Amino acid sequence: MPMISVLGKMFLWQREGPGGRWTCQTSRRVSSDPAWAVEWIELPRGLSLSSLGSARTLRGWSRSSRPSSVDSQDLPEVNVGDTVAMLPKSRRALTIQEIAALARSSLHGISQVVKDHVTKPTAMAQGRVAHLIEWKGWSKPSDSPAALESAFSSYSDLSEGEQEARFAAGVAEQFAIAEAKLRAWSSVDGEDSTDDSYDEDFAGGMDTDMAGQLPLGPHLQDLFTGHRFSRPVRQGSVEPESDCSQTVSPDTLCSSLCSLEDGLLGSPARLASQLLGDELLLAKLPPSRESAFRSLGPLEAQDSLYNSPLTESCLSPAEEEPAPCKDCQPLCPPLTGSWERQRQASDLASSGVVSLDEDEAEPEEQ
């Protein structure tokens, strides 16, 4: 019959018939001084290690049990058939979810330990992080290996706080460089510049190009440099409109046009026919609108000089000068912002379609 001596007590294992359950009973006290180790264990046939664990758990039960003076026959029997229930939670069979969670936590812990104790110190010691952050001169020649080694060693010699501060300073500097590049690109694209400054730059560049490419006559050169068109200004509500633009005689126009190349603006006969066609259009207009269109007559005559879009684009309000032309004198100072209205009126007059909505709206505003 198997017997186990644990904590100074003898445990008697009995089996209830063939194939029955194993029961354990305490018999007598072996010694007055309890021993905390298993003296000897004799397992019956077919008894698994789980039963051994159950026997070990009897250690605490035997100490908290009844006094040893009580006879073993008076003690209740302990059922050890359900060994899993007697095991502690850490020794029970784990489910697949618990095993997966344990594996994940173990893997995470291992990877974190490797990062903290292997990867991070190695990278800091070699200066890779500092080198990537502080390397700003892409176009500069690379330093010698000795210089790089000295930089790496100096970085690794710093304390952890100094390394973090240096790292943060490098990141902030990279952000500042990126922001400066974005501002430079936006200024190159013209997003920050106003329309007026853009027109001034464009007009100045076109004037230099036209002066070097086109063989202009003396009168047209004066027109390009010191001459501007302006809208007529009303002197009063009763008085008729007075033309403030410069009046150019037909002889001056012909002499200026003949100095240009034939391929640029066409033959003088074609321009003369356009001028005559405009005069015929003036005669056919009703009397109520004739006075308004007469004010546009010099404008359309001057606009025939600039049939080419290239020459029209050369004129902008940025080039306005008070010096008059040598063939004509201004009658009144030009108005600010009148260039767009004059261009619209001259385009309408040259195309043969007159829109007097703006001229009719001016008396209402005054």
UniProtKB/Swiss-Prot annotation:
The gene is FAM131A. It holds the Pfam family FAM131. InterPro entries: FAM131. This is Protein FAM131A. Residues 356-366 have a biased composition (Acidic residues). Transmembrane segments: none annotated. It comes from Homo sapiens. Belongs to the FAM131 family. Residues 342-366 are annotated as: Disordered.
